[in-house]
Amino acid sequence: MPIAYLIFLTILTPALVGGLNLIFHKNANLRDGVTLLGALITFYFSVNIFLGFDGQATQYKLVTIMPGIDISFHIEPLGVIFSLLASSLWILTHIYAIGYMRGAKEKNHSRFFLFFSFSIASVMGISFSGNLFTLFLFYEPVSYTHLTLPTTPYV
């Protein structure tokens, strides 16, 4: 599979998993299982990007908003390592969060994991951002979702 597709799948998988959280909100085991599966799939895509990366920086332009402003993705060694780190940590933090949320009998699990998944999708986008505009598009959702995560049990 071309690396360009893997980049999009690495970003879209956590976002889709976040949406599935809302669909399966009544069944806790299914909801948590789908989210954990999404974390594993995201890590799988990140590993495939790492294995398919030949060491040469590559630029992929998704769309041109106006001349000089593009949504583009850039594959380079540091971004690939960052995506591997973030996706592997998502698996561990997800397992911890399930235990914590259930053990503390917190409410709003689906909402928490929705924002958590969107946050990871944004982090994956940041790791492959090709310019400042794309970085800005993915950084803003990270700031909003990270602001919401600590307050989720109270909302």
Question: Which role fits each region the language model picked out?
Answer:
Residues M1-L16, F133-Y144:
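Alpha-helical transmembrane segments and their immediate interhelical/interface regions
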Residues M1-L6, L16, L20-L114:
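Transmembrane helix-loop-helix hairpins at membrane boundaries of multipass inner-membrane proteins
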Residues I11, F73-H74, S87, F128, ...:
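Short conserved micro-motifs on helix faces and helix-strand junctions that flank
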Residues L78, V142, P150:
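Anionic group-transfer/hydrolysis microenvironments
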Residues R111-L147:
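Alpha-helical multi-pass transmembrane bundles of energy-transducing inner-membrane proteins
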Residues H146-V155:
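Single conserved hydrophobic/aromatic residue that forms the stacking wall/gate
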